[in-house]
């Protein structure tokens, strides 16, 4: 986790990448990206946050009627202007847990399936990169131009 966070912090370049649809909308036009593009960052954070959320709701489902996760969450949300019920019965807590667990899981499954498709057969060169662990320099320039520039600058610095 800690090795990847610094590369997955959103920045202004990601907004441009999203506006251009990641290069999927127009053939041959790839927006600039660093080591990870906005789509990869979205997947990273969805898996980190969604995975934690599904794990927590799963634990609550494994040990029914032991937690008040939603009543507590609703109370926090009410402090910023929401008007959600906080006096939930244990049965209501379980119902919210089931709905949340199923919904977040479904969203993650859909996102991961799309990620697998795009990262394998949906993008030319992606499968080769996954198999070898390396990307062609021209592919990297086309899809992650800012990252290539950063790496070139690192390589150009003289050793001290």
Range-by-range predicted roles:
Residues 1-160:
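Membrane-embedded alpha-helical bundles that constitute the cytochrome b-like, heme-associated redox core
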């Amino acid at each position: 986790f800690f090795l990847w966070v610094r590369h997955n912090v959103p920045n202004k370049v990601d907004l441009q990448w999203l506006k251009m649809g990641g290069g999927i909308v127009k053939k041959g036009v790839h927006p600039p990206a660093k080591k990870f593009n906005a789509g990869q960052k979205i997947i990273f954070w969805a898996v980190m946050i969604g995975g934690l959320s599904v794990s927590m709701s799963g634990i609550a489902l494994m040990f029914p009627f032991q937690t008040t996760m939603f009543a507590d969450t609703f109370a926090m949300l009410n402090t910023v202007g929401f008007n959600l019920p906080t006096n939930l019965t244990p049965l209501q807590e379980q119902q919210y847990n089931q709905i949340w667990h199923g919904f977040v899981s479904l969203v993650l499954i859909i996102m991961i399936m799309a990620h697998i498709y795009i990262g394998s057969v949906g993008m030319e060169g992606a499968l080769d990169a996954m198999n070898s662990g390396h990307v062609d320099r021209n592919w990297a320039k086309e899809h992650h131009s800012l990252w290539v520039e950063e790496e070139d600058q690192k390589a150009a610095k003289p050793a001290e």
